[in-house]
């Protein structure tokens, strides 16, 4: 019997390859999520600050708006206006594309 061993070629360990691929992927994903959360919080703060700044300038009252809309409708009913549809305005203006004189 022979006491010799056959040298094996070095093979890449599959666990180390997974680490090389998944490590950067998870790192980039984590950085992206952190950036998205920071941007969301900044936007929310900016919108809240703008809302608190504009709120004292404007007070919304739906009843007041409804009353104003009714007044506009009533005032418009007193003024007779002629409103043409889009088809009636174009039908009488049809002209030939080429004006040929014979």
Swiss-Prot record:
The keyword Ribosomal protein does not apply. It is a single-pass membrane protein. The keyword Lyase does not apply. It comes from the Eukaryota. The chain crosses the membrane at residues 21-41. Glycans are attached at residue 3. Expressed in spleen, thymus, prostate, testis, uterus, small intestine, colon and peripheral blood leukocytes. It is found in: Membrane. This is Small integral membrane protein 29. It comes from Homo sapiens (Human).
């Amino acid at each position: 019997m022979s006491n010799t061993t056959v040298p094996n070629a070095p093979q890449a360990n599959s666990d180390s390859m997974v680490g090389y691929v998944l490590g950067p992927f998870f790192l980039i994903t984590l950085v992206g999520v952190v950036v998205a959360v920071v941007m969301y919080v900044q936007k929310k703060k900016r919108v809240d600050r703008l809302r608190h700044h504009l709120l004292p300038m404007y007070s919304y009252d739906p009843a007041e708006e409804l009353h104003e809309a009714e007044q506009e409708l009533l005032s418009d009913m007193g003024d007779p206006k002629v409103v043409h549809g889009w088809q009636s305005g174009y039908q009488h203006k049809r002209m030939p594309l080429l004006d040929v004189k014979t």
